[in-house]
Design a protein with these regions (language model features):
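Short hydrophobic core segments
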Residues: 6-8, 196-208, 348
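Dinucleotide-binding Rossmann-like beta1-alpha1 core, especially the glycine-rich loop
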Residues: 46-133, 290
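Active-site substrate-recognition segment that forms the wall
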Residues: 16-24, 33, 45-46, 82-88, ...
């Protein structure tokens, strides 16, 4: 019998989950209410977890698996005719003006290559070579170049996944889903006046998940952080599509996309009242101050837009996923934070397998959903 699965939330995680389920032959309904501030909608992803100094091994295992998962997924999407995936393996420059820090970075990359060959070539570049690859940079920065790194446009990838899922008979509905229950089983969802039944419901609702779970008496402890991300256009270049991603020694990043687009960001705003999607003067100032410090060549760029998204986090900054305790038929995943585009597609494949009762490739104890529920 074909298993009916409803996925609530069509960000990178929900879209990836639905895509995998549809490919595996499930009967899939995706419901999304298109809230402003979806993290995926705003996000520009850097797929380069190998240089991270985060000491949390459970986080690194997921991020590494996420990066490894991408090339196969993109190849699959392309074979289905999806050419606009927003993904390109353009390499990354991790820049610093302190040569000792460059030494440490190079050392870290080489150590991690042992169990992550997808990192590609690791090359140390001096100042001139660094600026040749990304001409807008300030003088004085050396870099470590990682050839296996990639960049992805969250919105483009999500749309490609959803189109492909729909070609495999998944149905996408706009609307506000309300969970339907009978005793301790979640049986489906209501959207407006319609009700849809399913064997499994998967909640991938990011910063809004708690609203969905509260009627069941679940307090899903997911906080969110506001990100403002700025898009600029270079006036005089032929194309910037093959420029590497730039990772400065801060919480900022610089990405070049096709058609002379440069994306810089992002803010990390924690004390947000409600879902405040406004672009603020202070947010823009922070992005520009930091961006121009690393890349003064941005000064002559044309301002295009600022996108705003809410990154969901758990208390220990680790994703959580699994069957929701006390309720049959309900699975949830959340808390991908700033790593959503790195981990989302891989975690979607794991959620799909979980929903269909197939073995998964990660130890769920590391990401136990009970940690985020009381």
């Amino acid at each position: 019998m074909m298993k009916k699965v409803i996925v609530v939330g069509a960000g990178i995680l929900g879209a990836s989950t639905a895509y995998q389920l549809a490919k595996m032959g499930a009967d899939v309904l995706i419901i999304d209410r298109k809230d402003n501030g979806q993290a995926t909608d705003a996000a520009a992803g850097i797929i380069c977890p190998w240089l991270s100094q985060r000491r949390n091994q459970a986080w690194y295992r997921l991020a590494k698996a996420g990066a490894r998962f991408y090339p196969g997924l993109i190849e699959e999407l392309q074979s289905e005719g999806e050419t606009e995936t927003g993904y390109a393996q353009v390499g990354a420059l991790s820049i610093h003006d302190d040569l000792e820090k460059i030494d440490k970075m190079e050392e870290r990359a080489n150590l991690r290559k042992a169990d992550a060959p997808e990192i590609g070539d690791i090359t140390r570049l001096h100042e001139k070579e660094t600026r040749t690859l990304f001409p807008l940079l300030a003088e004085g920065y050396h870099s470590v170049h990682i050839s296996g790194a990639a960049r992805v446009d969250g919105r483009a990838l999500r749309e490609a996944l959803l189109r492909s899922a729909q070609r495999n008979r998944a149905v996408l509905r706009d609307g506000d889903a309300v969970l339907q229950v009978q005793s301790n089983r979640v049986t489906g969802v209501a959207v407006g006046t319609e009700t849809f039944a399913a064997h499994v419901i998967i909640v991938c609702a990011g910063a809004w998940a708690n609203q969905l779970m509260q009627p069941l008496g679940i307090n899903f402890q997911v906080r969110y952080q506001k990100a403002q991300i700025m898009h600029l256009q270079i006036p005089d270049r032929e194309d910037t599509g093959d420029w590497p991603v730039v990772m400065p020694p801060s919480d900022q990043y610089l990405l070049a996309f096709d058609r002379r687009k440069i994306v810089i960001g992002a803010t990390h705003e924690n004390e947000i009242e409600g879902y405040d999607t406004r672009v603020t003067a202070g947010g823009m100032q922070e992005i520009l101050n930091k961006g121009l410090e690393y890349a003064p060549g941005l000064a002559n760029c044309t301002f295009q837009e600022v996108r705003v998204g809410f990154r969901p986090f758990t208390a220990d900054f680790l994703p959580v996923l699994g069957a929701v305790p006390g309720w049959d038929g309900l699975i949830a995943a959340n808390g991908l934070g700033a790593s959503g585009l790195t981990m989302g597609p891989f975690l979607g494949s794991q959620l799909a397998r979980m929903a269909l009762g197939m073995p998964i490739d990660i130890d769920l104890n590391d990401y136990d959903i009970r940690k985020a529920m009381d």
